[in-house]
Amino acid sequence: MIKVGSKNVQLSNISVMLIDPDKELSTLIRSVLKSLGFSTIHVARDGTAALNILHAHNVDLIITDWMMSPMDGINFVQKVRRDKDSPNPMVPVIMLTAQAKRWNVEYARDTGMTEFMVKPFTAKQLCAKITRVIESPRTFIVSPQYIGPDRRRKTEPYDADSGERRCVHDEAAIAKYSKDKLHLGQKEHEVFLVDRDFSLKEKIGKSVNLDDIFSEANVRLAQKIIYEAKGDFLHWFANDLKQLEESHHHFTEHHETQAAKMQMAQASLRIKGRAGTFGYNLASQVADALHDVIVQLHGEHDKIAQVIRKHMDAMYVILQQDIAGDGGDIGTALIASLGDLTKKYLH
Protein backbone atom coordinates (compact mmCIF):
# COMPACT_ATOMS: atom_id res chain seq x y z
CA MET A 1 0.00 0.00 0.00
CA ILE A 2 1.40 3.40 -1.02
CA LYS A 3 0.48 6.57 0.83
CA VAL A 4 -0.50 9.52 -1.32
CA GLY A 5 -0.91 12.61 0.78
CA SER A 6 -3.16 11.59 3.67
CA LYS A 7 -4.80 8.76 1.73
CA ASN A 8 -4.05 5.06 1.72
CA VAL A 9 -4.37 3.93 -1.86
CA GLN A 10 -5.57 0.35 -2.03
CA LEU A 11 -3.91 -1.11 -5.09
CA SER A 12 -4.11 -4.26 -3.00
CA ASN A 13 -7.77 -4.44 -4.05
CA ILE A 14 -6.61 -5.47 -7.53
CA SER A 15 -5.62 -9.11 -7.94
CA VAL A 16 -2.82 -9.74 -10.46
CA MET A 17 -1.65 -12.91 -12.18
CA LEU A 18 1.91 -13.02 -13.54
CA ILE A 19 2.75 -15.73 -16.09
CA ASP A 20 6.40 -16.18 -17.03
CA PRO A 21 8.60 -19.28 -17.42
CA ASP A 22 11.63 -17.24 -16.31
CA LYS A 23 11.63 -17.88 -12.56
CA GLU A 24 14.21 -15.21 -11.74
CA LEU A 25 12.63 -12.46 -13.82
CA SER A 26 9.10 -13.25 -12.66
CA THR A 27 10.30 -13.05 -9.05
CA LEU A 28 11.75 -9.63 -9.85
CA ILE A 29 8.55 -8.41 -11.53
CA ARG A 30 6.53 -9.66 -8.58
CA SER A 31 8.76 -7.65 -6.23
CA VAL A 32 8.27 -4.54 -8.37
CA LEU A 33 4.48 -5.00 -8.30
CA LYS A 34 4.59 -5.49 -4.53
CA SER A 35 6.56 -2.28 -4.10
CA LEU A 36 3.90 -0.40 -6.07
CA GLY A 37 1.15 -1.59 -3.73
CA PHE A 38 -0.24 -4.78 -5.26
CA SER A 39 -0.53 -7.53 -2.66
CA THR A 40 -2.39 -10.43 -4.31
CA ILE A 41 -0.10 -11.70 -7.07
CA HIS A 42 -0.59 -15.21 -8.43
CA VAL A 43 2.38 -16.66 -10.33
CA ALA A 44 2.30 -19.32 -13.06
CA ARG A 45 5.02 -20.71 -15.33
CA ASP A 46 2.82 -21.45 -18.36
CA GLY A 47 -0.68 -21.03 -19.76
CA THR A 48 -2.01 -24.35 -18.48
CA ALA A 49 -1.13 -23.56 -14.88
CA ALA A 50 -2.48 -20.03 -15.36
CA LEU A 51 -5.88 -21.33 -16.51
CA ASN A 52 -6.12 -23.43 -13.36
CA ILE A 53 -5.42 -20.35 -11.24
CA LEU A 54 -7.94 -18.31 -13.23
CA HIS A 55 -10.66 -20.87 -12.52
CA ALA A 56 -9.77 -21.07 -8.82
CA HIS A 57 -9.25 -17.39 -7.99
CA ASN A 58 -10.60 -13.99 -8.89
CA VAL A 59 -8.04 -12.29 -11.15
CA ASP A 60 -8.41 -8.64 -12.17
CA LEU A 61 -5.28 -8.16 -14.30
CA ILE A 62 -2.98 -10.56 -16.15
CA ILE A 63 0.64 -9.98 -17.18
CA THR A 64 1.90 -12.79 -19.41
CA ASP A 65 4.93 -13.76 -21.45
CA TRP A 66 4.56 -15.22 -24.96
CA MET A 67 7.02 -18.13 -25.26
CA MET A 68 6.04 -20.82 -22.77
CA SER A 69 5.29 -24.53 -22.87
CA PRO A 70 3.19 -26.59 -22.92
CA MET A 71 0.76 -23.67 -23.48
CA ASP A 72 2.17 -20.37 -24.70
CA GLY A 73 0.84 -16.89 -24.02
CA ILE A 74 -1.06 -16.61 -27.30
CA ASN A 75 -3.00 -19.86 -26.78
CA PHE A 76 -3.66 -18.83 -23.20
CA VAL A 77 -5.21 -15.51 -24.26
CA GLN A 78 -7.31 -17.30 -26.89
CA LYS A 79 -8.72 -19.63 -24.26
CA VAL A 80 -9.39 -16.79 -21.82
CA ARG A 81 -11.25 -14.84 -24.50
CA ARG A 82 -13.06 -17.65 -26.34
CA ASP A 83 -13.73 -20.61 -24.03
CA LYS A 84 -17.39 -20.66 -23.02
CA ASP A 85 -16.43 -21.65 -19.47
CA SER A 86 -13.89 -18.82 -19.15
CA PRO A 87 -14.47 -17.22 -15.73
CA ASN A 88 -13.55 -13.74 -16.99
CA PRO A 89 -13.26 -13.36 -20.79
CA MET A 90 -12.88 -9.58 -20.47
CA VAL A 91 -9.96 -9.60 -18.02
CA PRO A 92 -7.25 -7.13 -19.14
CA VAL A 93 -4.11 -8.87 -20.42
CA ILE A 94 -0.72 -7.18 -20.74
CA MET A 95 1.70 -9.20 -22.85
CA LEU A 96 5.26 -8.66 -21.59
CA THR A 97 7.63 -10.41 -23.97
CA ALA A 98 10.96 -10.20 -25.75
CA GLN A 99 9.10 -10.97 -29.01
CA ALA A 100 9.26 -7.46 -30.42
CA LYS A 101 8.71 -7.68 -34.16
CA ARG A 102 5.79 -5.82 -35.74
CA TRP A 103 4.05 -9.07 -36.64
CA ASN A 104 4.33 -10.18 -32.99
CA VAL A 105 2.47 -7.06 -31.87
CA GLU A 106 -0.21 -7.42 -34.54
CA TYR A 107 -0.69 -11.14 -33.91
CA ALA A 108 -1.01 -10.65 -30.16
CA ARG A 109 -3.44 -7.78 -30.72
CA ASP A 110 -5.58 -9.91 -33.04
CA THR A 111 -5.65 -12.65 -30.41
CA GLY A 112 -7.31 -10.31 -27.91
CA MET A 113 -4.39 -8.95 -25.91
CA THR A 114 -5.10 -5.61 -24.18
CA GLU A 115 -1.61 -4.05 -24.08
CA PHE A 116 1.77 -5.10 -25.46
CA MET A 117 5.03 -4.46 -23.63
CA VAL A 118 8.53 -5.43 -24.75
CA LYS A 119 11.35 -6.87 -22.66
CA PRO A 120 13.67 -5.28 -21.66
CA PHE A 121 11.45 -3.07 -19.56
CA THR A 122 11.55 -0.43 -16.84
CA ALA A 123 9.30 0.17 -13.85
CA LYS A 124 8.11 3.38 -15.51
CA GLN A 125 6.99 1.50 -18.64
CA LEU A 126 5.18 -1.11 -16.55
CA CYS A 127 3.35 1.60 -14.59
CA ALA A 128 2.33 3.31 -17.84
CA LYS A 129 0.74 0.12 -19.19
CA ILE A 130 -1.10 -0.57 -15.94
CA THR A 131 -2.34 3.02 -15.87
CA ARG A 132 -3.68 2.70 -19.40
CA VAL A 133 -5.55 -0.50 -18.52
CA ILE A 134 -7.16 1.03 -15.44
CA GLU A 135 -7.81 4.59 -16.59
CA SER A 136 -8.62 4.02 -20.28
CA PRO A 137 -10.43 0.70 -20.78
CA ARG A 138 -11.69 0.10 -24.30
CA THR A 139 -15.02 -1.12 -25.61
CA PHE A 140 -14.97 -4.91 -25.72
CA ILE A 141 -15.83 -6.63 -29.01
CA VAL A 142 -17.47 -10.06 -29.24
CA SER A 143 -17.80 -11.39 -32.78
CA PRO A 144 -17.34 -14.72 -34.59
CA GLN A 145 -13.93 -13.54 -35.87
CA TYR A 146 -12.59 -11.67 -32.86
CA ILE A 147 -13.12 -11.40 -29.11
CA GLY A 148 -11.19 -8.76 -27.22
CA PRO A 149 -10.70 -5.02 -26.67
CA ASP A 150 -11.54 -2.77 -29.60
CA ARG A 151 -8.39 -2.80 -31.73
CA ARG A 152 -9.21 0.62 -33.17
CA ARG A 153 -7.81 3.31 -30.89
CA LYS A 154 -8.58 6.16 -33.31
CA THR A 155 -11.32 8.58 -32.29
CA GLU A 156 -12.17 9.88 -35.77
CA PRO A 157 -14.91 8.14 -37.79
CA TYR A 158 -14.10 5.08 -39.88
CA ASP A 159 -12.95 5.90 -43.41
CA ALA A 160 -13.36 3.06 -45.90
CA ASP A 161 -10.86 4.68 -48.28
CA SER A 162 -8.08 5.05 -45.72
CA GLY A 163 -6.80 1.50 -45.99
CA GLU A 164 -7.93 0.73 -42.46
CA ARG A 165 -8.55 -2.97 -41.99
CA ARG A 166 -12.05 -2.67 -40.56
CA CYS A 167 -14.96 -4.41 -42.24
CA VAL A 168 -18.38 -2.87 -41.71
CA HIS A 169 -21.54 -4.49 -43.05
CA ASP A 170 -24.94 -2.87 -42.85
CA GLU A 171 -26.54 -6.23 -42.24
CA ALA A 172 -24.36 -6.96 -39.20
CA ALA A 173 -26.40 -7.14 -36.04
CA ILE A 174 -24.62 -4.85 -33.57
CA ALA A 175 -25.87 -4.73 -30.00
CA LYS A 176 -24.53 -2.97 -26.92
CA TYR A 177 -24.23 -5.03 -23.77
CA SER A 178 -22.93 -4.46 -20.29
CA LYS A 179 -20.28 -6.75 -18.83
CA ASP A 180 -22.71 -8.65 -16.59
CA LYS A 181 -24.94 -9.51 -19.55
CA LEU A 182 -22.16 -10.76 -21.81
CA HIS A 183 -22.46 -14.31 -23.13
CA LEU A 184 -19.87 -15.85 -25.46
CA GLY A 185 -22.37 -18.15 -27.13
CA GLN A 186 -23.70 -15.47 -29.46
CA LYS A 187 -25.48 -16.33 -32.67
CA GLU A 188 -23.53 -16.48 -35.91
CA HIS A 189 -22.83 -13.05 -37.46
CA GLU A 190 -23.85 -11.18 -34.29
CA VAL A 191 -21.46 -8.54 -33.02
CA PHE A 192 -21.64 -7.40 -29.41
CA LEU A 193 -20.11 -4.15 -28.20
CA VAL A 194 -19.61 -4.32 -24.45
CA ASP A 195 -19.48 -1.06 -22.52
CA ARG A 196 -16.09 0.12 -21.25
CA ASP A 197 -15.38 -1.59 -17.95
CA PHE A 198 -14.16 0.76 -15.20
CA SER A 199 -14.34 -1.85 -12.43
CA LEU A 200 -10.58 -1.70 -11.76
CA LYS A 201 -10.80 2.06 -11.37
CA GLU A 202 -13.69 1.60 -8.96
CA LYS A 203 -11.62 -0.86 -6.91
CA ILE A 204 -8.90 1.70 -6.22
CA GLY A 205 -11.35 4.61 -5.91
CA LYS A 206 -12.85 6.78 -8.63
CA SER A 207 -11.29 9.93 -7.19
CA VAL A 208 -7.79 8.45 -7.04
CA ASN A 209 -5.28 9.69 -9.61
CA LEU A 210 -2.87 6.96 -10.70
CA ASP A 211 -0.29 9.63 -11.50
CA ASP A 212 -0.12 10.17 -7.75
CA ILE A 213 0.26 6.45 -7.04
CA PHE A 214 2.85 5.97 -9.77
CA SER A 215 4.62 9.21 -8.89
CA GLU A 216 8.21 9.82 -9.89
CA ALA A 217 9.35 8.96 -6.38
CA ASN A 218 7.38 5.71 -6.20
CA VAL A 219 8.50 4.62 -9.67
CA ARG A 220 12.08 5.39 -8.70
CA LEU A 221 11.73 3.09 -5.68
CA ALA A 222 10.34 0.34 -7.91
CA GLN A 223 13.19 0.78 -10.39
CA LYS A 224 15.65 0.55 -7.51
CA ILE A 225 14.49 -3.03 -6.95
CA ILE A 226 15.50 -3.81 -10.53
CA TYR A 227 18.88 -2.12 -10.08
CA GLU A 228 19.53 -4.06 -6.88
CA ALA A 229 19.01 -7.35 -8.75
CA LYS A 230 21.64 -6.35 -11.31
CA GLY A 231 24.31 -8.16 -9.31
CA ASP A 232 22.57 -11.47 -10.00
CA PHE A 233 22.40 -10.89 -13.75
CA LEU A 234 25.91 -12.07 -14.64
CA HIS A 235 25.21 -15.38 -12.88
CA TRP A 236 21.93 -15.74 -14.82
CA PHE A 237 23.75 -14.76 -18.01
CA ALA A 238 26.35 -17.49 -17.46
CA ASN A 239 23.63 -20.10 -16.93
CA ASP A 240 21.82 -19.02 -20.10
CA LEU A 241 25.06 -19.29 -22.09
CA LYS A 242 25.58 -22.76 -20.65
CA GLN A 243 22.15 -23.78 -21.94
CA LEU A 244 22.95 -22.23 -25.32
CA GLU A 245 26.20 -24.20 -25.40
CA GLU A 246 24.43 -27.50 -24.73
CA SER A 247 21.72 -26.83 -27.31
CA HIS A 248 24.29 -25.71 -29.88
CA HIS A 249 26.19 -28.97 -29.31
CA HIS A 250 23.05 -31.01 -30.01
CA PHE A 251 22.33 -28.88 -33.06
CA THR A 252 25.88 -29.26 -34.41
CA GLU A 253 26.87 -32.81 -33.47
CA HIS A 254 23.57 -34.68 -33.36
CA HIS A 255 21.48 -32.61 -35.78
CA GLU A 256 18.63 -32.50 -33.24
CA THR A 257 17.38 -29.49 -35.13
CA GLN A 258 13.85 -28.77 -33.90
CA ALA A 259 14.40 -29.31 -30.17
CA ALA A 260 17.73 -27.48 -30.24
CA LYS A 261 16.22 -24.58 -32.20
CA MET A 262 13.46 -24.15 -29.63
CA GLN A 263 15.87 -24.27 -26.70
CA MET A 264 18.28 -21.80 -28.30
CA ALA A 265 15.43 -19.46 -29.26
CA GLN A 266 14.10 -19.46 -25.71
CA ALA A 267 17.55 -18.86 -24.23
CA SER A 268 18.30 -15.99 -26.63
CA LEU A 269 15.00 -14.27 -25.83
CA ARG A 270 15.61 -14.75 -22.12
CA ILE A 271 19.05 -13.14 -22.43
CA LYS A 272 17.63 -10.29 -24.51
CA GLY A 273 14.98 -9.46 -21.91
CA ARG A 274 17.21 -9.84 -18.88
CA ALA A 275 20.26 -8.09 -20.31
CA GLY A 276 18.42 -4.98 -21.47
CA THR A 277 16.48 -4.72 -18.23
CA PHE A 278 19.74 -4.56 -16.27
CA GLY A 279 21.49 -2.16 -18.63
CA TYR A 280 23.53 -4.65 -20.66
CA ASN A 281 22.24 -3.28 -23.94
CA LEU A 282 24.99 -4.77 -26.12
CA ALA A 283 24.28 -8.27 -24.80
CA SER A 284 20.58 -7.65 -25.43
CA GLN A 285 21.25 -6.61 -29.05
CA VAL A 286 23.47 -9.64 -29.71
CA ALA A 287 20.86 -11.97 -28.21
CA ASP A 288 18.16 -10.36 -30.36
CA ALA A 289 20.28 -10.83 -33.48
CA LEU A 290 20.95 -14.43 -32.47
CA HIS A 291 17.23 -15.09 -32.11
CA ASP A 292 16.67 -13.78 -35.63
CA VAL A 293 19.32 -16.18 -36.95
CA ILE A 294 17.77 -19.12 -35.11
CA VAL A 295 14.20 -18.55 -36.24
CA GLN A 296 15.15 -17.83 -39.86
CA LEU A 297 17.53 -20.77 -40.30
CA HIS A 298 17.85 -20.49 -44.06
CA GLY A 299 21.12 -21.93 -45.30
CA GLU A 300 23.48 -24.86 -44.89
CA HIS A 301 23.35 -26.51 -41.47
CA ASP A 302 27.09 -26.11 -40.80
CA LYS A 303 27.06 -22.43 -41.77
CA ILE A 304 24.09 -21.77 -39.52
CA ALA A 305 25.96 -23.44 -36.66
CA GLN A 306 28.99 -21.22 -37.36
CA VAL A 307 26.93 -18.02 -37.28
CA ILE A 308 25.26 -19.08 -34.02
CA ARG A 309 28.70 -19.84 -32.56
CA LYS A 310 30.00 -16.35 -33.47
CA HIS A 311 27.04 -14.75 -31.67
CA MET A 312 27.67 -16.94 -28.63
CA ASP A 313 31.38 -16.04 -28.65
CA ALA A 314 30.43 -12.35 -28.67
CA MET A 315 28.26 -12.87 -25.61
CA TYR A 316 31.06 -14.74 -23.83
CA VAL A 317 33.28 -11.68 -24.34
CA ILE A 318 30.56 -9.40 -22.94
CA LEU A 319 30.19 -11.68 -19.92
CA GLN A 320 33.91 -12.08 -19.25
CA GLN A 321 34.67 -8.37 -19.61
CA ASP A 322 31.42 -7.30 -17.91
CA ILE A 323 30.55 -4.90 -20.74
CA ALA A 324 27.50 -2.91 -19.65
CA GLY A 325 25.69 -0.37 -21.81
CA ASP A 326 26.01 -0.47 -25.59
CA GLY A 327 29.77 -1.01 -25.62
CA GLY A 328 30.52 2.26 -27.42
CA ASP A 329 32.43 2.05 -30.70
CA ILE A 330 33.44 -1.54 -29.96
CA GLY A 331 29.80 -2.51 -29.53
CA THR A 332 28.79 -0.80 -32.77
CA ALA A 333 31.56 -2.59 -34.66
CA LEU A 334 30.63 -5.93 -33.09
CA ILE A 335 26.97 -5.66 -34.09
CA ALA A 336 27.97 -4.63 -37.62
CA SER A 337 30.39 -7.55 -37.99
CA LEU A 338 27.77 -10.05 -36.81
CA GLY A 339 25.30 -8.58 -39.27
CA ASP A 340 27.79 -8.88 -42.13
CA LEU A 341 28.55 -12.47 -41.15
CA THR A 342 24.87 -13.36 -41.09
CA LYS A 343 24.31 -11.88 -44.56
CA LYS A 344 27.35 -13.72 -45.90
CA TYR A 345 26.38 -17.19 -44.71
CA LEU A 346 22.59 -17.11 -44.55
CA HIS A 347 19.94 -16.13 -47.05
Feature map (PLM): residue ranges:
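Active-site beta3 strand of CheY-like receiver
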Residues: 57-64
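Two-component/phosphorelay signaling modules centered on CheY-like receiver
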Residues: 23-45
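Helix N-cap/capping motif at the beta->alpha junctions
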Residues: 43-52, 73
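C-terminal output helix
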Residues: 121-134, 142
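Receiver (REC) domain active-site loop signature in two-component systems and cognate sites
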Residues: 68
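CheY-like receiver
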Residues: 9, 135-210
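Alpha4 helix (beta4-alpha4-beta5 surface) of REC/receiver domains from two-component response regulators
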Residues: 30-31, 75, 89, 100-115, ...
